[in-house]
């Protein structure tokens, strides 16, 4: 798709999602700014990196100056989310309400809460009972209300657990791929024989870019393209085939520190551990039908992720 003449796309948050979105938008020919508090990091072709703080309306206004479309990919550590994320929403919503920029929000599955294995679609009721799930549901209600009341133009894209290049803090991230490559121990969270959806971070980026290019998607929640759910054991087996040896899994059947998942993280994540004790199956067919964007096969995503981690570990070894 060709870029809209003169349109500026501004991405808030330079984690794996924000960085991937910025790169995807640049690949599509858009003018792109990537904003985080530091304004530094790896050089990205076609992306202008700037420092900004979206914790206040004034800060958010400065960050999105001149933007036609804003992508909210900001996240914070689990133990800070309940205190910090509502304020960021207030600031970002307030800023786009003043400027008229469209807002595309990266969202989670937390509002659904425990599903007892029910396939999650955009029509699944929001039954969150955890503090973080209720917080995310309240944020989403605010976004949709702002759109309905014509205070802002908003689209929400929900993702399952991330996997892919640059993804570290995920259950299929830095706890798994380095150990797979080196023969170390891989945590097997909960019941790995349950089906579990994982979203390629590159598909997340493509999906959010499509929402940014298509106002017809505004005013609702979408499930971003996600490959059919597989059991985590099947994914570990496929990963073992790619690295040439079976993974050395260690069962973690309750939330406790393991590897990169320290005590602070696990204590905060404990209320969401149900995601590993019941099937987590996300269906993205509505998005696929509407926008014609299919998810990447999980085997391809695993190969892409391994390639990135090989480079990541090699670069770290030289430091």
What are these regions, as identified by a protein language model?
Residues 90-138:
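Conserved Rossmann-fold NAD(P)-dependent oxidoreductase catalytic core, especially the SDR/UDP-sugar
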Residues 108, 141-166:
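Conserved beta-loop-beta element that borders a ligand/cofactor-binding pocket
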Residues 149, 160-195, 239:
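NAD(P)-dependent short-chain dehydrogenase/reductase
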Residues 195-202, 222-242, 296:
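Substrate-binding strand-loop-helix patch
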Residues 288, 297-319:
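Amphipathic terminal alpha-helices
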């Amino acid at each position: 798709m060709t870029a809209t003449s003169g349109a500026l796309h501004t991405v808030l948050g330079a984690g794996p999602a924000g960085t991937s979105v910025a790169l995807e938008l640049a690949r599509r020919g858009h003018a792109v700014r990537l904003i985080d508090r530091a304004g530094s990091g790896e050089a990205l072709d076609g992306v202008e990196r700037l420092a900004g703080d979206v914790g206040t309306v004034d800060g958010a206004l400065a960050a999105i100056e001149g933007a036609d479309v804003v992508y909210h990919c900001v996240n914070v550590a689990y133990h800070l989310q309940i205190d910090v994320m509502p304020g960021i929403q207030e600031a970002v919503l307030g800023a786009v309400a003043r400027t008229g920029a469209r807002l595309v929000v990266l969202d989670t599955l937390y509002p659904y809460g425990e599903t007892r294995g029910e396939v999650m679609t955009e029509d699944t009721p929001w039954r969150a009972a955890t503090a973080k799930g209720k917080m995310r549901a309240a944020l989403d209600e605010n976004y949709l209300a702002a759109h309905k009341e014509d205070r802002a133009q908003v689209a929400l894209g929900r993702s399952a657990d991330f996997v892919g290049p640059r993804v570290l803090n995920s259950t299929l991230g830095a706890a798994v791929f380095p150990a797979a490559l080196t023969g170390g121990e891989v945590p097997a969270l909960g019941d790995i024989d349950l089906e579990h959806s994982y979203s390629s971070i590159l598909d997340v980026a493509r999906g959010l870019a499509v929402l940014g290019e298509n106002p017809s998607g505004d005013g609702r929640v979408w499930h971003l393209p996600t490959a059919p759910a597989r059991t985590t054991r099947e994914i570990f087996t496929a990963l073992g085939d790619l690295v040439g040896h079976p993974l050395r899994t260690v069962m973690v059947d309750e939330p406790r520190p393991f590897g990169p998942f320290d005590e602070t993280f696990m204590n905060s994540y404990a209320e969401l551990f149900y995601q590993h004790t019941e099937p987590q199956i996300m269906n993205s067919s509505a998005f696929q039908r509407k926008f014609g964007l299919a998810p990447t096969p999980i085997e391809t995503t695993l190969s892409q992720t391994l390639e990135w981690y090989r480079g990541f570990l090699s670069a770290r070894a030289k430091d």
